[in-house]
UniProtKB/Swiss-Prot annotation:
GO CC annotations on file: extracellular region
Family: Belongs to the conotoxin O1 superfamily.
Residues forming coiled coils: none
UniProt domain comment: The cysteine framework is VI/VII (C-C-CC-C-C). The presence of a 'disulfide through disulfide knot' structurally defines this protein as a knottin.
Tissue: Expressed by the venom duct.
An example Gene Ontology molecular-function term: toxin activity
Predominant location: secreted
Compartments (UniProt record): Secreted
Keyword Glycoprotein: no
Disulphide bond pairs: C1-C17, C8-C21, C16-C25
Protein name: Delta-conotoxin TsVIA
Keyword line: Disulfide bond, Ion channel impairing toxin, Knottin, Neurotoxin, Secreted, Toxin, Voltage-gated sodium channel impairing toxin
Its biological purpose: Delta-conotoxins bind to site 6 of voltage-gated sodium channels (Nav) and inhibit the inactivation process. This toxin inhibits tetrodotoxin(TTX)-sensitive sodium channels. A test on mouse Nav1.6/SCN8A confirms this sensitivity.
Amino acid sequence: CAAFGSFCGLPGLVDCCSGRCFIVCLL
């Protein structure tokens, strides 16, 4: 969760925790 948050904003990655970014949420 925290890991994805760090990449939030980059293409192909998302922040499942914050819910701000959502492109390809695998987890």
